[in-house]
């Protein structure tokens, strides 16, 4: 049985996520086969690009039902960047598009004209920023409040239930930077690009039962 399956649906630099797991001692398999996902102990859904394209590719690749099934069965599941956004109900990126609706909520665009310290904030939000820890999932055991992590995104999550928010970040607005619900942990930031902090998340996820 594959221990960690990284879903390859044509969206994102999956090799960097795979290398992140390798650095902390875990073998992760990049797969475009839904059957491998169904057989895996832990599942990772990365994602870079437009929400609608990511969702379409998941559907065309036959991944939607396997993802919903492994989540229902309680297997550890990690969503990264757009992979986190896809877990919500819908996104307003390029229209209104339905997501997996595992976490009720919406994906919104950063408002225009945001300012901080007298300077206009550019969209996308790109670079290092601080986390404010609200709840600490097992994968965040070594993530300190105020830890710096790496973001690249123009849209952010707004879960209906604030109790699922594990961490927030502020960029013009305070937004949800990480989600934790049961067996699901998801990050808007890229743990594979977040140096020691991010690698600790991958390591602790790999150790989840």
UniProtKB/Swiss-Prot annotation:
Its EC number is 4.3.2.10, 3.5.1.2. The keyword Glycoprotein does not apply. The active site is at 81 (nucleophile), 190, 192. One of its GO terms (cellular component) is cytoplasm. Residues 3-209 form the Glutamine amidotransferase type-1 domain. One of its GO terms (molecular function) is imidazoleglycerol-phosphate synthase activity. Pathway: Amino-acid biosynthesis; L-histidine biosynthesis; L-histidine from 5-phospho-alpha-D-ribose 1-diphosphate: step 5/9. It is found in: Cytoplasm. Coiled coil: none annotated. Keywords: Amino-acid biosynthesis, Cytoplasm, Glutamine amidotransferase, Histidine biosynthesis, Hydrolase, Lyase. Pfam families: GATase. The keyword Ribosomal protein does not apply. It comes from the Bacteria. One of its GO terms (biological process) is L-histidine biosynthetic process. IGPS catalyzes the conversion of PRFAR and glutamine to IGP, AICAR and glutamate. The HisH subunit catalyzes the hydrolysis of glutamine to glutamate and ammonia as part of the synthesis of IGP and AICAR. The resulting ammonia molecule is channeled to the active site of HisF. Heterodimer of HisH and HisF. PANTHER family: IMIDAZOLE GLYCEROL PHOSPHATE SYNTHASE SUBUNIT HISH. NCBIfam families: IMP_synth_hisH. This is Imidazole glycerol phosphate synthase subunit HisH. The gene is hisH.
């Amino acid at each position: 049985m594959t221990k960690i399956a990284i879903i390859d649906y044509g969206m994102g630099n999956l090799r960097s996520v795979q290398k992140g797991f390798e650095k902390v001692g875990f073998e992760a398999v990049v797969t475009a086969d839904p059957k491998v996902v169904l057989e895996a102990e832990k599942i990772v859904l990365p994602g870079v690009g437009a929400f609608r394209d990511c969702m379409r590719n998941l559907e065309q690749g036959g991944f939607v039902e396997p993802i919903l099934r492994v989540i229902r069965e309680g297997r550890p599941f990690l969503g990264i960047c757009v992979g986190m956004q896809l877990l919500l109900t819908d996104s307003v990126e390029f229209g209104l598009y339905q997501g997996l609706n595992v976490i009720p909520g919406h994906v919104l665009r950063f408002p225009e004209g945001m300012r901080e310290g007298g300077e206009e904030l550019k969209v996308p939000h790109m670079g290092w920023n601080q986390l404010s820890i609200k709840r600490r999932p097992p994968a965040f055991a070594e993530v300190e409040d105020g830890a710096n992590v790496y973001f690249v995104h123009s849209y952010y999550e707004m879960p209906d239930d604030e109790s699922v928010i594990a961490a927030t970040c502020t960029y013009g607005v305070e937004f949800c930077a990480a989600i934790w619900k049961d067996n699901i942990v998801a990050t808007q930031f890229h743990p594979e690009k977040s140096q020691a902090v991010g690698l600790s998340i991958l390591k602790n996820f790999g150790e989840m039962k």
